[in-house]
Design a protein with these regions (language model features):
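Macromolecular interaction modules
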Residues: 2-256
Length: 256
């Protein structure tokens, strides 16, 4: 039992009643955390058990305004599909076998980000930033290939029967294809969004490719945890997530 000054034993913090009454409270998708990680070979089992049994919950899903999540894995028999060979993100090209996707409510990404920073600093101080416990360096276990919070820009659906964007991570999609596209400085990212929506995605989405979602990555906050790599070119980059109803290999030549 504990006592909080002025509230008696185990009194709830009044902020928990006040904060939900303020600001947006929309069911819409407003942003995402996309985190693409490569564990070191000798730490694969320990890292994944820690991530799914602890960090995926306490470092993400139990926080306010985050409402859906899913992980995908790129096994060896899919990694040969990756391109370009001189990728500036996946170095080497097979790096980043695990990707976590997390949806954040519209209008709440800034609020969620502040909670996330506080919670993750606490977890590291509590010795839960590593599956090995306090005092161990996370960079010995894993490295972040591409991790960023994103602003949502829209969806391109195959047809009206495809579940809406907010439900995407709850659907039993068999595959995910991720594209990171950098815009030329001129005409810039908005022109690239227009081209993607009017020309690129209509050719790509269809058949067993059910939906594609577009996101703009944000710079990581200056007080981020030190082991998380700062993504490059976030002011020019667009992240595309293509959700498939099949093994990616079966539609790769046709769609990608």
């Amino acid at each position: 039992m504990s006592e909080r000054e002025g509230h008696g034993i185990d009194a709830p913090d009044p902020a928990y009643r006040r904060l939900p009454t303020e600001g947006p409270h929309s069911p819409a998708l407003g942003g995402a955390l996309i985190t693409w990680v490569e564990p070191m070979p000798e730490h694969v089992v320990g890292y994944n058990r820690w991530y799914e049994d602890d960090h995926m919950i306490t470092g993400a899903m139990s926080m306010p305004w985050m409402f859906s999540c899913r992980r995908f894995v790129a096994p060896r028999w899919l990694q040969h599909l990756r391109a370009p060979a001189d990728s500036r993100v996946a170095v080497p090209l097979e790096a980043g076998k695990y990707i976590g996707l997390y949806w954040v409510n519209e209008g709440r990404i800034d609020d969620h980000l502040q909670w996330s920073l506080g919670a993750n600093y606490r977890l590291h101080e509590d010795g839960r930033g590593s599956y090995r416990g306090r005092g161990f360096d996370p960079t010995e276990e894993r490295r972040h290939v591409f991790t960023a919070f994103h602003d949502y820009r829209g969806a391109f659906y195959r047809d009206a029967e495809v579940p809406r964007d907010i439900h995407t991570l709850a659907q039993p999609y068999e595959g995910l294809v991720v594209e990171l596209v950098d815009a030329d400085p001129a005409p810039g990212r908005e022109a690239l969004h227009d081209w993607l929506e009017s020309e690129h995605l209509p050719r790509m989405v269809g058949g067993r490719v059910a939906v594609s979602l577009r996101f703009d990555p944000r710079p990581l906050p200056p007080d981020k945890l030190g082991h998380v790599r700062e993504p490059e070119a976030v002011d020019r980059r667009i992240t595309l997530l293509h959700f498939l109803e099949c093994d990616p290999r079966s539609v790769w030549a046709e769609r990608f």
